């Protein structure tokens, strides 16, 4: 499927070396103030060729809105947006037609579909997340406009190097941790990492590049101001919908909510979040080990999500593969232009998937009117 969502639906389309990529967003209520710039600023955060640690393939990724906006506001009809490819070098991939790249989707696509566009990974390329980002930009605007929901992501780990900044290290100030100073620090760092040891992580990536290799990492996502009651108790749980949306990104290999796998090591007395009333008689959690979700439903605390991102599979080192046509084993040396690490560029995509899942659940749950704002 190329569509995600039930009430707020995103259909992403296009291939890495095709003419264009884009998305159709259906189910966005009318009267939401929205311009091309709202989408462009998110696309700019994920576009390639503008960082030491991204692919040299330089693309402007200029978005054009084709429908669904009138006089600066949504109309409630499908919003269609397109981004044209301008810097393809398809000849770099001609030798890969019958030799699937280890770690890529080449083999599974070839065996499932037979005829597929292998250039630059085709439909499985990270470039196809342009559609996700278009949908996410609209979802972010909807959540912010209706409920002041803020979503932010940042790198907490590169390879085996753990950063010293994460939500649980900052729990005393968790309600105020997302601010302009932090956002600027993240966005001005090539790894989108606010930790004090980010330079050590940079050196780790540079060393991998020198050795014709790639690295992965861990990203933390925080969503503030999510109201109580989003999600369902059995199927359609908030944590289930978030995990599903995030795991639909090719590079993602794992998702944790709150303390995640660490919770298996804790005692019940350590894991349980005790309650109290604040000065305004609002129910609060003393801790937030649950990551903002109890029984599949938001509890008013910040959503805390961690995502494991694998190393970029395209590496310059020689690897062993097969030739599907000749039925032989051979060595493969991948050319083309590739990211040594995808972690910083995938952050806006992951933020988008969180926003899309939340928007869909909140429309379905009555928090956002499905027709007009």
Curated annotation (Swiss-Prot):
Residues reported to bind NADP(+): 46
CDD domains in alphabetical order: Chorismate_synthase
Residues noted as binding FMN in the record, renumbered to the chain: 123-125, 250-251, 295, 310-314, 337
GO molecular function, one term: chorismate synthase activity
Cofactor: FMNH2
Pathway, per record: Metabolic intermediate biosynthesis; chorismate biosynthesis; chorismate from D-erythrose 4-phosphate and phosphoenolpyruvate: step 7/7
InterPro entries given in the database record: Chorismate_synth, Chorismate_synth_AroC_sf, Chorismate_synthase_CS
EC number: 4.2.3.5
Entry-linked HAMAP family: Chorismate_synth (MF_00300)
Similarity field: Belongs to the chorismate synthase family.
Record function comment: This reaction introduces a second double bond into the aromatic ring system.
Name of the protein in question: Chorismate synthase
Species: Methanococcus aeolicus (strain ATCC BAA-1280 / DSM 17508 / OCM 812 / Nankai-3)
